[in-house]
Amino acid sequence: MFNRLRTATFAVLSVLAAQVCAAPVTLDVTGWKGGGAEPANLAALIAKFEKENPDIKIKFEYMSRNDTTTVVSSRLQGGNGPDVLMVDRELMRQWQGAHQLLDLSSEKWVPTIWRGVRAHTQIGGKTYMLPMELVGIGLFANLDLLKRAGVAMVPTDVDQLKAACGKLAAAGVTPMLLPAKEGWAPAALVIASGLSAGDADARAESFVGAGSARFAADPAFKQSVAALKVLADAKCFVPRLNDGVSAWSTGLTEFQAGRVAMMPQGAWNIAKFSATKGLSFQFAPLPALVSGNGPVALDMLGTAWAINAATHQPDAAKKWLAFWAHPDNDRRFLDAEAGFSPFEGGTDAMPPQAQPYAAAQKNGHVVLYPKGVWTGGLFTAIWNSMSAYFLDIGQDPAKLLARWDGAAR
């Protein structure tokens, strides 16, 4: 009797133990994609991951980029941060500096990161994030409006822009919108052309830190700023009117409505513009503002995944990152974002309208947007100065660039 009872008890305990062992691990993941206006196919990818890894359950929490900076930072500091965090280069630097991110250097996917991006996922030669996308910043051009004015191709430099603007204005078409309320759009043009005059990564690094190069003394940056006045004088845009236009609202509406021929913006708008009936457009590289230079594909290293150094589920977290490193999975994300793959041999998801941009990128006419290399304070100074420049576009470019130098120190 005792032996039968002991055997039965052991059997029950074995079943309970097996159930405990079989219980799925819950992985807390936060990100600013996957909700709001950018679902980014994340729900489908989570479902696919859970199907392939039935022992892991993803608990995804959507929060904005701004909230991520404050809320997640506080949770990490308090020891109750998520297991996996969506990051960008700026957040990677911040959290790695506080020793809050796991070193991923030994992961199998590290050598597959595109060589032009790999260094930007590292600090001190160690890898701390898995990149998810490269997103282009380029020039949107309304092909019907260009054709109406007799402009055969999207301009690639200042001289072509001036000629195109003259034809467009003569045809009664607003040639260009350069929204300057936030300063972002004109700054993107200047940064792309300024950094393209040499090794872009090295130049970006050279302008920050003690004893570094000076924007105000750099010929390429001075010429790039001055070129904006040249374009204004050529009737490409009206500076004071553009100073009141937001790149994130009014500017998008104006281009989408077919009321402007050209506007610099990000590839993340391609899906929205493609869904607009009757809007025929191309997404091209940014035109060169520096004499002798070619057009520039301004690539921005977008979102990435990192792992909390204090996670209790490191193996499950690494499986989540390895899942995203697979080209078929990342492609589904890129399809929604109209992005480039950050992996060697990865498949890009750029639609036909973006082929001019893709060609420039593949030909090496690329500048990586220096977010994470330049501080948030420097970018704020850049954007504010560009907005102010549109109120007084006759000012000396060197004086404007001196404000950048002050913020870079």
Each predicted region: which residue ranges?
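Glycine-centered hinge/linker elements that transmit conformational signals in sensory
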Residues: 166-167, 209-241
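Short, solvent-exposed loop/beta-turn-alpha elements that line the ligand-binding surface or hinge
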Residues: 105-113, 197-223, 275-276, 288-296, ...
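A structural signal for short loop-to-beta-strand junctions that line the ligand-binding cleft
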Residues: 83, 111-145, 174-178, 295-297, ...
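Extracytoplasmic/periplasmic solute-binding protein
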Residues: 130, 137, 162-213
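Conserved C-terminal helix/tail region of periplasmic/extracytoplasmic solute-binding proteins
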Residues: 147, 362-409
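Conserved N-terminal structural module of periplasmic/extracytoplasmic solute-binding proteins
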Residues: 2, 10-13, 20-94, 109-110, ...
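Hinge/lid segment of periplasmic solute-binding proteins
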Residues: 89-138, 162, 282-284, 354-355
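Extracytoplasmic/periplasmic substrate-recognition and gating elements
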Residues: 47, 52, 147-149, 233, ...
